[in-house]
Amino acid sequence: MELNVMDHPLVSHKLTLLRSVDTPSPVFRQLVEELVTLMAYEGTREVRIEPTTVTTPLTATEGVALTRPKPLVVPILRAGLGMLEGMMRLIPSAEVGFVGMARDEETLQPMTYAERLPKDLSGRQCYVLDPMLATGGSLGGTVEFLVRRGADHITCLCILAAPEGIENFRKLVRDLDVPCHLIVAGLDDHLDEHGYIVPGLGDAGDRLYGLAE
């Protein structure tokens, strides 16, 4: 697994605003979108391209185009949805699939409750979106799911990660025979006894969309 912790002043600035308890949901959503677009620039560095010819107003010239099959963006529900627009802003021709993964608050293990993905992902580059890499279970379970369907290159984008989550995720994917890249905007200190990232930014889903009773 290849880890990239982003080092950019705008990333740090937006992450600081996201952490603030005083940032309301509408502003939080906008900041997430902006931050993910910055992350997507780095995350798509290895997106597959092929030569093509384009005609300018003056002449024909060589260029590149994204290869087929198209990249697949996979937000993990529900918080991952908040990252989708920022990703699609940079790569609008990508297709989108969904995985519903929730954490059992007693065992801290991931549970899949929904999925909407192509049955065959052979030859697909997949971009998995999950704001918080805490225990690593949800992200690792999603990556394993995609690999079983044939995905051969996976990049995961997370806004925050805990060291424990990165280590657990590394263990979960180390035996997978596909390249796996992890892009994080910030690396925090640790997990608390409830499995939450500290200092963190709170529950990303609740801060994006409010608390669903």
Swiss-Prot record:
Allosterically activated by GTP. The keyword DNA damage does not apply. It catalyses: UMP + diphosphate = 5-phospho-alpha-D-ribose 1-diphosphate + uracil. Keywords: Allosteric enzyme, Glycosyltransferase, GTP-binding, Magnesium, Nucleotide-binding, Transferase. One of its GO terms (molecular function) is GTP binding. Catalyzes the conversion of uracil and 5-phospho-alpha-D-ribose 1-diphosphate (PRPP) to UMP and diphosphate. This is Uracil phosphoribosyltransferase. The lineage of its organism: Bacteria, Bacillati, Actinomycetota, Actinomycetes, Propionibacteriales. The gene is upp.
